[in-house]
Each structure stands twice: as structure tokens, then as C-alpha cells.
Design a protein with these regions (language model features):
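Perimembrane loop-to-helix junctions flanking transmembrane segments
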Residues: 32-54
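Terminal transmembrane helical module of multi-pass membrane proteins
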Residues: 136-183
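Membrane-proximal helix-loop-helix units in multi-pass membrane proteins
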Residues: 81-137
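Non-cytosolic membrane-interface motifs at loop->transmembrane helix junctions
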Residues: 51-52, 116-130, 151-155, 181-183
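Alpha-helical transmembrane segments of multi-pass membrane proteins
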Residues: 13-33
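Membrane-helix interface/capping segments
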Residues: 67, 71-89
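Juxtamembrane "helix-exit" motif on the non-cytosolic side of transmembrane helices
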Residues: 24-31, 107-120, 142-146, 169-178
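Interfacial helix-start motif at the membrane-water boundary
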Residues: 48-70
Length: 183
């Protein structure tokens, strides 16, 4: 039986992420201005001077992560037997998704806060959003392995976590902290 309540809830949070990215990075309200802002995702100062080829590579991975998340959430909404997995409790599934999506939604605002006036403290605040999302994603991966999920769910969560944990939680955080220390 498909869990429409959980699906609707996670869909709304997913839309909130998209909205926060468009609102802050697209600056559609002209509220999120700072020196050096451009209206190109590829040339955005939020990439901290990464080469275009690396940005393109990360965008491909981001798209695969979005597809992976959809694959995983479909499994979570249709699965009824998680065995002894941490995901067997609905409140755990909900908490992990809320932490992951909630802090992913807050991240663009914290990143803007950093860009307005870079400092080590602000970079750590910004990175903490990514770190909390990363921890939630790691636990989602663990629960998916524990539940002996079907291959599509496992591949989906691994695609997602490669971006959330490695590209964002480690890579982008390293660039942000480096920027705060040496710029």
C-alpha cells in the first residue's frame, strides 16, 4: 500500500528546497544581492571559483541525485517490511527525511548569509546545514542496507548520498571553509 501521506509530506519539502534555491540563487525577488552576484547557476560565486568542467560534473551528479531520491522515496512509500532496519519506525523515516530536506532548504539562506559577510563562524554555520543533511543521508543509506532493499532503492539512495555527503558535506564545505580562511 502506497503511503500517500508520507509521499505528500516529502514532496512538499522537496518543493521547498527547489523554491529556496530559486529564491536565493536566482534572486527572483532581488532581495538576495551581494557584491559579485551573477544570475547564472554555472558561473555563480557560490561555486567559489571551481572550474566550469567541475561545475558541469557536479550538476550531472545533482541531477542523478534527484532521480535517486525519487527512486528511494518510492521504495520507502511502498515498503511495508523493513525487518530490523532503523527505517522500520515511521517516525525515524520521517525524522531523517525532515532533517535531510529541512536543512537542505535552509542551506541556501545560510550560504547567502555567508556570502554577504564571509567569516569562519558564518562558514561553519553554513556548513552545519550540509553536515546535518549528510548525517541524515548516511542514516538513510544505513537503513536501506539494513532493510535489504530492492536494487533500485539502494542505487537511488547511493546516488543521492554521493552528492549530499561527498560533494556537499565534504567538498563544498571544504571550499567554503577554505574561502573563509584565505580570502
Amino acid at each position: 500500500m502506497f503511503d500517500w501521506t508520507f509521499f505528500s509530506f516529502t514532496s512538499l519539502l522537496g518543493i521547498a528546497i527547489a523554491f529556496s534555491y530559486v529564491l536565493v540563487f536566482g534572486n527572483i525577488t532581488d532581495v538576495f544581492n551581494f557584491d559579485g552576484i551573477v544570475h547564472s547557476y554555472i558561473d555563480s560565486p557560490y561555486w567559489f571559483g571551481m572550474s566550469r568542467n567541475n561545475v558541469y560534473s557536479l550538476i550531472v551528479l545533482q541531477l542523478l541525485a534527484a532521480v535517486g531520491y525519487i527512486m528511494w522515496i518510492i521504495w520507502v512509500c511502498t515498503e511495508t517490511n523493513y525487518g530490523t532496519s532503523v527505517l522500520r519506525f515511521r517516525w525515524v523515516r520521517s525524522l531523517l527525511v525532515v532533517l535531510f530536506l529541512g536543512f537542505s532548504t535552509l542551506w541556501p539562506f545560510s550560504a547567502y548569509y555567508y556570502m554577504v559577510s564571509p567569516s569562519l563562524g558564518r562558514s561553519l554555520l553554513t556548513c552545519s546545514c550540509l553536515w546535518i543533511s549528510s548525517i541524515a543521508a548516511i542514516l538513510m543509506v544505513a537503513g536501506t542496507f539494513e532493510a535489504n532493499s530492492p536494487p533500485y532503492a539502494l542505487v537511488g539512495i547511493l546516488l543521492l548520498s554521493n552528492v549530499v555527503v561527498l560533494a556537499d558535506g565534504v567538498g563544498w564545505s571544504a571550499k567554503c571553509i577554505q574561502h573563509s580562511l584565505y580570502s
